[in-house]
């Protein structure tokens, strides 16, 4: 609704300016006012749809949280070497958003290359936007930030300034407040896919590329029961206060968002959906045909016999010989 006021001010002001144009001001002003009324009708429809559905009163704050789930598919990085630009997977300094002791938050489409000592090595990509030193996610630091985020959101909602806080959060994404902790370079040419690439891994990544938001939400839904136990045992008071407040006011959509946000930081995080990929691999292997050997019939002087040693390269791979 607050955004609608800004849009109405712009459209109505534009219509008034069109009306002051000599000779053609009357028809242009009328058309511009009709357009402004049409925009107002669309805004009323959006306000009704998002404000009257049970548990779905989306505000700018909720849209700010949902904006964190999108992953641009066209992200790419280049490295400037003596005037020549080379496409690389290494993150430039402009792609680094936040740095912790053992984790780096960056924009999608690259992997940080950190210079430590006298060597540069690639960090392990845990998610499209988070890389760690050894592939293990430091859940303590991230969950501390989630506590602060949810606690701030709860306070903003209790004070009825959720739209203002949401606007501040959106503007805050344009700036970096933390100091640099690591020396990132572009001399590694890191791989987006660490480890052994299998067909199941490629199929899983293809599914995530089709709908990264849906894949992320489904993976987090399966972690909610364990996340509830973790937030109680770990005394995450910000998250608990947020869930309690939003439950009391009947805002179940925000309760679900808080649970998904906390469940996204799991103590047993695997690289690029490796947990679900490993489970799916075990199911698919049950239907695998297994090794086989083709039987070859050889005609020698008019008589047929079986030659079991006539193996080609593919047979050798299937049988293990």
From Swiss-Prot:
Topology Cytoplasmic: residue spans: 1-52
Residues bearing carbohydrate: 80, 93, 118, 189, 301, 307, 314
Domain of life of the native organism: Viruses
Record Pfam families: HCV_core (PF01542), HCV_env (PF01539), HCV_NS1 (PF01560)
Gene Ontology process terms (BP): clathrin-dependent endocytosis of virus by host cell; fusion of virus membrane with host endosome membrane; symbiont-mediated suppression of host innate immune response; virion attachment to host cell
Propeptide residue intervals: 62-75
Stretches the record annotates as HVR1: 268-294
Region called Important for fusion, residue ranges: 149-180
Keyword Metal-binding among record annotations: no
Site (Cleavage): residue numbering on this chain: 61-62, 75-76, 267-268
Important for lipid droplets localization, as annotated region: 48-51
Keywords assigned: Apoptosis, Capsid protein, Clathrin-mediated endocytosis of virus by host, Fusion of virus membrane with host endosomal membrane, Fusion of virus membrane with host membrane, Glycoprotein, Host cytoplasm, Host endoplasmic reticulum, Host lipid droplet, Host membrane, Host mitochondrion, Host nucleus, Host-virus interaction, Inhibition of host innate immune response by virus, Interferon antiviral system evasion, Membrane, Oncogene, Ribonucleoprotein, RNA-binding, Transmembrane, Transmembrane helix, Ubl conjugation, Viral attachment to host cell, Viral envelope protein, Viral immunoevasion, Viral nucleoprotein, Viral penetration into host cytoplasm, Virion, Virus endocytosis by host, Virus entry into host cell
Region (Interaction with APOA2): 6-57
InterPro entries hit by this protein: HCV_Core_C (IPR002521), HCV_Env (IPR002519), HCV_NS1 (IPR002531)
GO MF term (any one): RNA binding
GO cellular component: host cell endoplasmic reticulum membrane; host cell lipid droplet; host cell mitochondrial membrane; host cell nucleus; membrane; ribonucleoprotein complex; viral envelope; viral nucleocapsid
Transmembrane segments: 53-73, 243-263
Topological domains annotated Lumenal: 74-242, 264-321
Protein family per UniProt: Belongs to the hepacivirus polyprotein family.
More about this protein: Viral particle assembly takes place at the surface of ER-derived membranes in close proximity to lipid droplets. NS2 associates with E1/E2 glycoproteins, NS3 and NS5A, which interacts with the viral RNA and core protein to promote genome encapsidation. The nucleocapsid buds at the ER membrane where E1/E2 glycoproteins are anchored and afterward associate with nascent lipid droplet to acquire APOE and APOC. Secretion of viral particles is probably regulated by viroporin p7.
Protein name in UniProt: Genome polyprotein
Species name: Hepatitis C virus (isolate HCT18)
